[in-house]
Amino acid sequence: MIGLVGKKIGMTRIFTEEGTSIPVTVIELKENRITQVKNINTDLYCAIQVTTGIKKSNRLNKPQSGHFLKSGVTPGRGLWEFRTDKNNNFKIGQSITINIFNNVKKVDITGISKGKGFSGTVKRWNFHTQDATHGNSLSHRVPGSIGQNQTPGRVFKGKKMAGQLGNTRVTVQSLNIVRIDERRNLLLVKGAVPGATGSDLIVKPAIKV
């Protein structure tokens, strides 16, 4: 299923005719240019590789420069892939625009969440804090026991503990499309999406309708 790579512009709100306020995220979806078409014979799977935006040639390393030169496509700010069916008719240099969402009502959006640094269990996993008083003087925000006894004598894998929060790949599913501005290549979706303002987002038609 193909989609588009875009940029998060920020959040705002729009009003319906009844006066209801809808919080929306504005996503800029400029044309995506196909740089490579992968198939079963050469790559063992079918996909298209796309780029978007513009990157100066002097900011490219040699492998990137050679790849864009071979495809004859204007260098973009990155490379992304979308899986396709075996019988696809995509060609190198072809452009994919925001028009692919004209008949779509909901989308799945993937991005890199904001990094929050090293965080404790209360902030990271919503652990309950311990008593503020009643004899507790040192253990207000500690996780408490992390295991059992001599049996099993270890901490189980996956135990929720303190660690880095955020800066991970996150997908938010089934966000409603509120408006499409084809002239300015803007997509307005209801609600929040992962990532900071200006970060890259992958927008696809929703799997769950």
From Swiss-Prot:
Claim: Transmembrane helix is one of the keywords in the record: no
PTM comment, free text: Methylated by PrmB.
InterPro entries: Ribosomal_uL3, Ribosomal_uL3_bac/org-type, Ribosomal_uL3_CS, Transl_B-barrel_sf
Gene Ontology CC annotation, any one: cytosolic large ribosomal subunit
PANTHER family tied to this protein: 50S RIBOSOMAL PROTEIN L3, LARGE RIBOSOMAL SUBUNIT PROTEIN UL3C
Function: One of the primary rRNA binding proteins, it binds directly near the 3'-end of the 23S rRNA, where it nucleates assembly of the 50S subunit.
Subunit description: Part of the 50S ribosomal subunit. Forms a cluster with proteins L14 and L19.
Name used for this protein in its record: Large ribosomal subunit protein uL3
Organism, as annotated: Buchnera aphidicola subsp. Acyrthosiphon pisum (strain Tuc7)
